[in-house]
């Protein structure tokens, strides 16, 4: 074929021998070479930037040929100048897709040409995106293991030209019951899906044939991110709901800070529900986390200053956990809870059950969180640090072993109905969350924020025209303390490449929009 003379110089080349046999046309500004062959059907036209403006097709050919035979090079030129001058970029087409990708891997953002300040930029041209292989490639599932490639071609050829057909096989060479078919155009692939999807049940298959577009790299990446998120959520739920001491010590910095805020504002009423065992809430988890932190800190340090800090801190914890609401105990808790800040630096130490057992020594049975804290040893801080930790650990044992699994199950059932609801909680208990992943729904956001308290509603907003997520939503709790715990734990929480933004929803009286 022959390319017409244009302002964008075009030189087609296959080898040095062809250049020598071209009657000198390659030396012309707009020279073109005749070829009897064509590039592979899946060849990629690549855009290349950051090349010297003084370079001609000859220099570019020498740059690209080490990676494979070059079919065509087009230098982009500024037509407003006479003669047209190079814009410092070009298009190159190799005969094979493999050569183009190898050149991209070796040059893109790696090699800087003489006289240039930035490395070469090499990527598929925009025109290639509309006809990418992944847009025309089909996955065929529930295929009879007796079928071969020719059988699949015969089955799908009525819907258009097939460029590639491949059956997936195991190491033993036997079919895995699925295949990939690549058509010449996306329209052909779509026609095949409409006609063939679930159209028949093949021999040896349990369900009808599946015909759909094959997963793209983007789809695979999204699935990987979803799996990572599921693992993170599982760890979060386990740490905050099932009484895992190791997990709880990892969460204590947020809870300790929250407890300090409550005590600094003299809000003892916020803790009134701790002794009630009818339902799980975030405050009970905060108590458990703080007790675990105290035990971990005592086990990991033997310095006098640490022991002193723990003595005062564990004393206040006992008062906090006690159902006895006496004024004296409340005052003691108010005066000594300020020392919880000391525990924040120690909460990172993890401690196993065996270590706590060794630390506790002889355990005197006490129900620290189950309503049985009758002694004043913890509330007035007069008991020794080891006694206080022994009692605290006894409470953890009883609480985690007897109550927490049941309470978690009850709470889980109660909160499932919150997904999709737009019911609001009290002032200061409503959260606005954005930077949510596109694929997140109401159930996902509910599962994410359940560990911090009783959720009354969880809603992801959907665009009515596109039916796609707007990537933001609302979560409401039944109390402001749970909302603050969620903010401290989840604001900045990374999901894939995104970091969540979690903040309080503005009051209805606020004239500013959300």
Curated annotation (Swiss-Prot):
GO terms for cellular component: cytoplasm; nucleus; ribonucleoprotein complex. Residues 44-127, 136-216, 429-507 form the RRM domain. SMART domains: RRM. It is found in: Nucleus; Cytoplasm. CDD domains: RRM1_CELF1_2_Bruno (cd12631), RRM2_CELF1_2 (cd12634), RRM3_CELF1_2 (cd12638). Keywords: Cytoplasm, mRNA processing, Nucleus, Repeat, Repressor, RNA-binding. InterPro entries: CELF1/2_RRM1, CELF1/2_RRM2, CELF1/2_RRM3, Hud_Sxl_RNA, Nucleotide-bd_a/b_plait_sf, RBD_domain_sf, RRM_dom. Belongs to the CELF/BRUNOL family. The keyword Ligase does not apply. Pfam families: RRM_1. This is CUGBP Elav-like family member 2. GO terms for molecular function: mRNA 3'-UTR binding. It comes from Danio rerio (Zebrafish). GO terms for biological process: mRNA splice site recognition; regulation of alternative mRNA splicing, via spliceosome. RNA-binding protein implicated in the regulation of several post-transcriptional events. May be involved in pre-mRNA alternative splicing, mRNA translation repression and stability. PROSITE patterns: RRM. The keyword Repressor applies.
